[in-house]
C-alpha cells in the first residue's frame, strides 16, 4: 500500500514538473509567471486571472470569426461597369397544343389493331393526356371504351410519357426548313431542343442549361442526337447582347398547330408551369428586360453550398433530376408532395431512379390532383386545409437573371407571313447594373483573423502551436524513454 502511494506521488510529481518545465519555456505570454518562485501568491493569482480572461476572450473572438466564415463569408454586390458586359437574353419555352404526329399514330394503331371509333377515342385520350398538367387534369376523358383500349394495348401508367414521346415528331430534326422548329436571330441559328416539362413535351430556345435538360435524357437517359440541320448553319448556343445594341431579339418559329402556350424565363432556369401565356393563336411577342446575377470565379472553390446559400447546376442534391435549378428543385418538391398525398406521381416527371415511385393512372390524375391543384402549384395554402404543409426549401441559383416582362403582344399575321406561329423575345433596354456574388471572408482571412486574435490576447503564433505539439508528443516520449534533450 505504501509502495503504491509512493509511486502515485512520484508520478504526480513528474507530471507537475513537466508542466512547470513547459510553463517556464513556452512562448505564450504569462504562463511562466505562474511558476516563478520570485513572485508571491497574490501576484501568481493575479496572473492566473489575467490568463483565464485572455484565453476566454481569445476563444470567444475566434469562434466569432469561425461563425462569420461559415455564415457571412459571401455577399451580393452591385457592379456598374456595364459597357464591358454581355448579357444573356431570356429563354423561351413553347408548348404546342397538338402534340401527336398523325403518321406515327396511324402506324401505332395499325400495329396494335386499333380501328374505327376506337382510333378516334384513343387519339383524343392521348392528346388530352399529353396536354395535361396540374390545372387541367380533370379534362382527361374517362369512359369504359378508354379502359378497354388501354387494356388491349397493355398501356401502363409508367409508359404514358414514353408512348407520347414515340408518337410525337421532334420537328427540330425536320429536313424542310419551312416546316422545321427553329430559333433564329436574323440569319443566325440559336440552339433549340425538345424538353420534357410539367406541361409535357415542349421546345426550349436560348438556354444556358446543359443537354441533360432534354426530353430524350429525362425519358431514356441519353443525350439528344446530333442535329445536322442546326449545325450546318451558323449556330449560337444562346443569344447575348450589350449596352450598345439597342434592340436585340430572336424568335422560336415553326409551329403549325392552332395555338401554342409560351413561357418566358431566365436563360439559367426552366419554365414554371403556372407562368404561361395562356393559349396564343397568333404567337406571342415578349418585350423583356433582364438583370443578371453573376458569381466570382473562385466562389465555388472557396465556399460550400451552405456558406454561399446557392447552388451551381452540377451541384444537384435532387433524386429525380441530374442537375439543379431552383425551379427544378420545386418540381421535385411537387413530386414528393404528390406522392405523399396521392400515393403516386404524374407521368411527365423523370423517374429513372434506384427506387422508382409509382406513376399515377389517368383516373387518379382526374380524381386526386384537381382538388389539390393550388397546393401543388404554390406549395402552400392560405386556408391551411392540409394537416402537413409542404416543407420545401430550395436554394437560389448562383448564376441567374431576373426577367421583367414589359409587355406581351400577339404576333398578328405570323401564320400568313411565316407559315406558322411561334414566340419572339425582344430586349430594347439593357441593365446598367448587375448583381455579383462575392467572397468577402475567405479561408485565408479566417486564418489571419484567428492568428491575429491569438497573438493579441496570448502572444501565440504558429511556432507556439508547434511548440505545444512538440512538448506533448516528441519530447514527452523521449522523457519516458529516459533520454535528456
PLM ranges: what are they?
Residues 1-485:
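Non-transmembrane functional regions of membrane and envelope proteins
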Amino acid at each position: 500500500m505504501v509502495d503504491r502511494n509512493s509511486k502515485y506521488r512520484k508520478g504526480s510529481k513528474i507530471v507537475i514538473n513537466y508542466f512547470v518545465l513547459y510553463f517556464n519555456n513556452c512562448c505564450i505570454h504569462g504562463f511562466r509567471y505562474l511558476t516563478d518562485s520570485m513572485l508571491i501568491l497574490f501576484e501568481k493569482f493575479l496572473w492566473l486571472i489575467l490568463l483565464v480572461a485572455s484565453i476566454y476572450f481569445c476563444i470567444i473572438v475566434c469562434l466569432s470569426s469561425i461563425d462569420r466564415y461559415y455564415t457571412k463569408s459571401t455577399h451580393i454586390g452591385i457592379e456598374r461597369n456595364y459597357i464591358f458586359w454581355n448579357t444573356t437574353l431570356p429563354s423561351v419555352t413553347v408548348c404546342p397544343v397538338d402534340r401527336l404526329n398523325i403518321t406515327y399514330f396511324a402506324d401505332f394503331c395499325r400495329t396494335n389493331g386499333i380501328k374505327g371509333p376506337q382510333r378516334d377515342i384513343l387519339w383524343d385520350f392521348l392528346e388530352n393526356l399529353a396536354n395535361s398538367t396540374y390545372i387541367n387534369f380533370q379534362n382527361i376523358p374517362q369512359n369504359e371504351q378508354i379502359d378497354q383500349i388501354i387494356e388491349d394495348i397493355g398501356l401502363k401508367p409508367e409508359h404514358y410519357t414514353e408512348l407520347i414521346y414515340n408518337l410525337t415528331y421532334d420537328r427540330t430534326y425536320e429536313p424542310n426548313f419551312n416546316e422545321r422548329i427553329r430559333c433564329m436571330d436574323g440569319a443566325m441559328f440559336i440552339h433549340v431542343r425538345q424538353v420534357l416539362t410539367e406541361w409535357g413535351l415542349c421546345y426550349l430556345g436560348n438556354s444556358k442549361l446543359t443537354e441533360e435538360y432534354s426530353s430524350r435524357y429525362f425519358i431514356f437517359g441519353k443525350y439528344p442526337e446530333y442535329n445536322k440541320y442546326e449545325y450546318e448553319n451558323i449556330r449560337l448556343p444562346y443569344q447575348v447582347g450589350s449596352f450598345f445594341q439597342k434592340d436585340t431579339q430572336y424568335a422560336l418559329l415553326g409551329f403549325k398547330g392552332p395555338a401554342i402556350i409560351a413561357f418566358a424565363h431566365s436563360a439559367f432556369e426552366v419554365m414554371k408551369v403556372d407562368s404561361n401565356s395562356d393559349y396564343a393563336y397568333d404567337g406571342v411577342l415578349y418585350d423583356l428586360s433582364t438583370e443578371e446575377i453573376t458569381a466570382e470565379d473562385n466562389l465555388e472553390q472557396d465556399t460550400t453550398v451552405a456558406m454561399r446559400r446557392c447552388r451551381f447546376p452540377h451541384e444537384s442534391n435532387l433524386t429525380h433530376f441530374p442537375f439543379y435549378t431552383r425551379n427544378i428543385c420545386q418540381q421535385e418538391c411537387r413530386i414528393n408532395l404528390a406522392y405523399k398525398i396521392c400515393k403516386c406521381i404524374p407521368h411527365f416527371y423523370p423517374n429513372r431512379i434506384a427506387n422508382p415511385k409509382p406513376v399515377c393512372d389517368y383516373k387518379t390524375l382526374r380524381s386526386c390532383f384537381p382538388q389539390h391543384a393550388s397546393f401543388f402549384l404554390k406549395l402552400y395554402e392560405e386556408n391551411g386545409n392540409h394537416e402537413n404543409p409542404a416543407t420545401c426549401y430550395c436554394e437560389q441559383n448562383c448564376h441567374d437573371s431576373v426577367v421583367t416582362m414589359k409587355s406581351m403582344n400577339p404576333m398578328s399575321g405570323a401564320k400568313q407571313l411565316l407559315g406558322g406561329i411561334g414566340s419572339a423575345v425582344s430586349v430594347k433596354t439593357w441593365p446598367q447594373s448587375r448583381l455579383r456574388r462575392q467572397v468577402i471572408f475567405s479561408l485565408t482571412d479566417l486564418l489571419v483573423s484567428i492568428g491575429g486574435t491569438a497573438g493579441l490576447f496570448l502572444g501565440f503564433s504558429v511556432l507556439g502551436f508547434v511548440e505545444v505539439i512538440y512538448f506533448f508528443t516528441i519530447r514527452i516520449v523521449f522523457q519516458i524513454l529516459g533520454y535528456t534533450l
